[in-house]
Amino acid sequence: MGFGWQGSVSIAFTALAFVVMAADWVGPDVTFTVLLAFLTAFDGQIVTVAKAAAGYGNTGLLTVIFLYWVAEGITQTGGLELIMNFVLGRSRSVHWALARSMFPVMCLSAFLNNTPCVTFMIPILISWGRRCGVPIKKLLIPLSYASVLGGTCTSIGTSTNLVIVGLQDARYTKAKQLDQAKFQIFDIAPYGVPYALWGFVFILLTQAFLLPGNSSRYAKDLLIAVRVLPSSSVAKKKLKDSGLLQQSGFSVSGIYRDGKYLSKPDPNWVLEPNDILYAAGEFDVVEFVGEEFGLGLVNADAETSAERPFTTGEESVFTPTGGAPYQKLVQATIAPTSDLIGRTVREVSWQGRFGLIPVAIQRGNGREDGRLNDVVLAAGDVLILDTTPFYDEEREDSKNNFAGKVRAVKDGAAKEFVVGVKVKKSSEVVNKTVSAAGLRGIPGLFVLSVDRADGSSVEASDYLYKIQPDDTIWIATDIGAVGFLAKFPGLELVQQEQVDKTGTSILYRHLVQAAVSHKGPIVGKTVRDVRFRTLYNAAVVAVHREGARVPLKVQDIVLQGGDVLLISCHTNWADEHRHDKSFVLLQPVPDSSPPKRSRMVIGVLLATGMVLTQIVGGLKSREYIHLWPAAVLTSALMLLTGCMNADQARKAIYWDVYLTIAAAFGVSAALEGTGVAASFANGIISIGKNLHSDGAALIAIYIATAMLSELLTNNAAGAIMYPIAAIAGDALKISPKETSVAIMLGASAGFINPFSYQCNLMVYAAGNYSVREFAIIGAPFQIWLMIVAGFILCYMKEWHQVWIVSWICTAGIVLLPALYFLLPTKVQLRIDAFFDRVAQTLNPKLIIERRNSIRRQASRTGSDGTGSSDSPRALGVPKVITA
C-alpha cells in the first residue's frame, strides 16, 4: 500500500474504533471524538488540528442541527398528528394498512428529518393500528424503513444526505468545480424515488411471512387462569353480556367454581366474584383484557387456595392473587440439562431456589389435562413466572436450569394514574365507541368508565356505547402513556379549568411527578383543603397510590405519604420547589407539553415556506438562500410566534449525532491525508476498469457504504466513505453527483441491525421487537435493495425509463389485492395454498399459528354465534398447562 506509518496508525485505530462500536461497548459519539483526538496527537503528521476541527462548522452538519428545531416546532403544534390521522383513515387488512401508513411517511420524510417523523408517528400508528385491528409489529418496522426510504428522495430528506452535500460543497469549492457538483433539492430524486418505491413494494409483497406480528414475542397460545375480582366489571354479569367473548385473540375455554370445572361454559352463565376463568390466547392479549375487565392472574401458589374461600380484600388488577403484587413477569425455557425435568411443579421449591412462582406453562402438540402443580416438567417447556423480591437472574441455579436468557414479559412496577378527560363538542371521537376512537389497546392505557353528561355512568365493558359530547372518560394510565393522552385531539383534562387558572402559558406548561413526603404538611388533607392551586400555582391532574386505585375525583383525595401526584405546572416549577418539605422527589414527565394547536397553521406554513425556498432555487438552478440560514430563520420565527419555547428547541437537538458526524469528518480527513482513502479507492477503480463499467464501481461504493452503515451510524459511514468514493469517481471520470448518490443510498441502508440507525432503535423499543425479528425482514430487504440499487446505478442516464417502470409496478402491487377478489374462488384457494407453502418454508411456525388463530376465531363464533364451543381441545392450542 502507498502510505507510511501515518496511514498504518490511522487504519489500525480506525479499525479498533469500528470493533468498539460494533460491539456496542462505547457510543459512536464518544468513540469518534476520542479517535479524532488521538489522530491529532502526532504534531499534525496524521491530521492537523484545523482540519480535525473543520467538521464542527460544516454547513451540512449545521443544517442538520437546525432542521431538528424546525421539526420540533411543527411537532409541538400538533399539526403533523392531525394531518396524519386524516390521511391514515381506516383499514382492515395489513396490506392496505401498510400502504396507507408507509406512503404518507415516505412523502413527509422527504422534506423533514426522518428522526422527528418517526418520533411523532410511533404513538399515532400504535393507536391507529389498534383501532384498525392490525398488529403493531406489522407497522413499526415499516415505519422506520419508510422514513429512511422517503429521505433518499431529496437532498434534505436525511441528515446523511445533508452531510454528503456539505462534504461535496467543501471539496469541489476548493477545486473550483462546484457548478457541476452542487446539489439542488431534487437532484437525488431521479434515483432515490425508484429506490424508495421498490423498497415499498418489497414490504407489501413479503409482509405476510417476513414481518413479525403474527404472534406475540412471548409464549403463544397460553391457557391462563384469571380470577374475577370483587371489583371486576364482569362480576354478576352473564358471560355473553360481559364483553369478554368479543375480545380479539382472547377466548374463555373453561370456568372453575366451588371445586368444579366447566369446560364448555354456557353464554348465559352468570360470573361471580372469585370465579376462575381459563383464558386462551397470547399473554399480552390476556393481560390487556385482564386490565380492562378487572381480572386477577392466578399463579401456582394461589392455585392451592382455589378450594378454600377467597378473601375479598383489595387486590390489584391483573397481578397474581394470593400474594403481594408482582414486580414483573418473566418467561423462561426449561434447559435439556435441567434437574427440574421429570419433577412436578409442586415438588420444586420455586421461591427458595429461583425467587419465582409459575403462572403458566406452554408445551407443544396439544394440551394435557391436569392442574399446574401436578404437571411433570419436560425439556423445552416454556414457563411464565411471577417474580418475588428474592428473584435474581444471575443466580447460578437459574443459569443451569433455564435455556438462554430469562426475558421480562411485564413490568408490574409502573405507576398507574387515574386521569379524567372530557370530550369536546367538536371532537372526532363523538359518536364512536371507545375502540373506534382509538382509546383501547394503547400500551399502558386502560379505559375504566365513562361518566355521561346527564350524571349516569357507563362501564368500560360496554363495547357498544358511543361517546357523546361532554362525556368524561376515566382512564388508568402509566406515565409513559400520559404524553399520548395529553396530545389526543378532541379531549381535555377534567382538571383543565384548574390548570388554566394557574395562569401558566401553554407554551411553558408540562407535567411533573411529585412524591408526597410522609411528614409533609399536606399529608392527611384533601387536595381541595390544601388549596393546591393557590398555594403552589399548579394543578393536580391525577394521583398514584401504591397498591390501590384512588377515587376518581382528584379534589376529594386525602393525600398520604408516598402518594405520587401528577401535576400540571410551569417548566421551572420543579426547580423552584426542589427543597419544598411537602415533596421528597420531583421528576418532569418527558414529552408532556400540551400541543399548541392555535399555532398549527403558522408552524406548517413556516416549514412549507422553508422547503419552497429550496424547491424554487432548485428549479431556477440558483441558490436564493442556503438551507442552513433558512432553517435558522424558520426556527426563530417559530420561537417568536409561540410554536415552541427555547427549552424545547434546545432539547430537540441530538447532540450525540452532532458529535458523531463532526468527529467522523475529521477522521475521514485523516484517512484522505495519509493516503489510506486513495489506497481503498484504487480497489474501486480497479473494479470499474476491469469490468469496463462505471456502474460496477458505483455498485461497489454502494455495497461498501451499506455494509459500513450496519456497523456504524449512517452518518459516520457516509463521512468515512466519501473521500474514498470521491477519489475513485474522479479517477474514473464519474460525475461527482452520481458518486455521491451511491453513498447517500448506501449510507441510509441500515436495515438489518436495529442499532445501526436511530429510527430503527426507536421502533425496536416501541414495538418490543427482538434482534432476530429485525434480521428476518432486514437481511432480505438489504439484499433486495442492493439489487435495486445496482440497476439504478447502472442506468443512471436512463432514469426516465426507470421511473416509469417503478411507478407502474408499484401501482400494480398496491392494487393487487383488489384484483385478487375478482378471481374465481378456486384460483384464490390455489394462490392461498402457494403463499402458505412459501410462508411455511420461510417460517414453519407461522402456518401453525395462523391455523390456531382461525380455530380460536371459529370457536368464539360457534354455531350459536356466542362462543359456546370454546374448550381447550377446540382451541387447537399447543399443550398448555396452567392453574
Curated annotation (Swiss-Prot):
Whichever gene encodes this chain, its name is SLT2
* Transmembrane segment boundaries: 3-23, 30-50, 60-80, 106-126, 139-159, 185-205, 600-620, 624-644, 657-677, 693-713, 774-794, 802-822
**What processes does the entry annotate via GO biological process terms?**
potassium ion transport
- Pfam families under this entry? CitMHS (PF03600), TrkA_C (PF02080)
Q: What induces it?
A: Up-regulated by sulfur deprivation.
User: What would you give as a GO molecular function for this chain, any one?
Assistant: monoatomic cation transmembrane transporter activity
Name the segments for region: Disordered.
857-883
Lineage start: Eukaryota, Viridiplantae, Chlorophyta, core chlorophytes, Chlorophyceae
Q: Low complexity bias located where?
A: 861-871
- The RCK C-terminal domain covers 211-295, 317-401, 406-491, 497-583
Q: What does this protein do?
A: Na(+)/sulfate cotransporter with a probable high-affinity for sulfate and a proteasome dependent turnover.
**What does the UniProt keyword field contain?**
Cell membrane, Membrane, Repeat, Stress response, Sulfate transport, Symport, Transmembrane, Transmembrane helix, Transport
> What are its GO cellular component terms?
plasma membrane
Organism, per UniProt?
Answer: Chlamydomonas reinhardtii (Chlamydomonas smithii)
Phenotype upon knockout?
Answer: No effect on sulfate uptake, due to the redundancy with SLT1 and SULTR2. Slt1 and slt2, as well as slt1 and sultr2 double mutants show a 50% decline in uptake while the slt1, slt2 and sultr2 triple mutant exhibits no increase in sulfate uptake capacity when deprived of sulfur. Modified regulation of the SLT3 gene that becomes up-regulated by sulfur deprivation instead of down-regulated as in wild-type.
What's its membrane topology?
A: Multi-pass membrane protein
In the record, the note on similarity to other proteins reads: Belongs to the divalent anion:Na+ symporter (DASS) superfamily. Na+/sulfate symporter (TC 2.A.47.4) family.
Protein name as catalogued: Sodium/sulfate cotransporter 2
Where is the protein localized?
Answer: Cell membrane
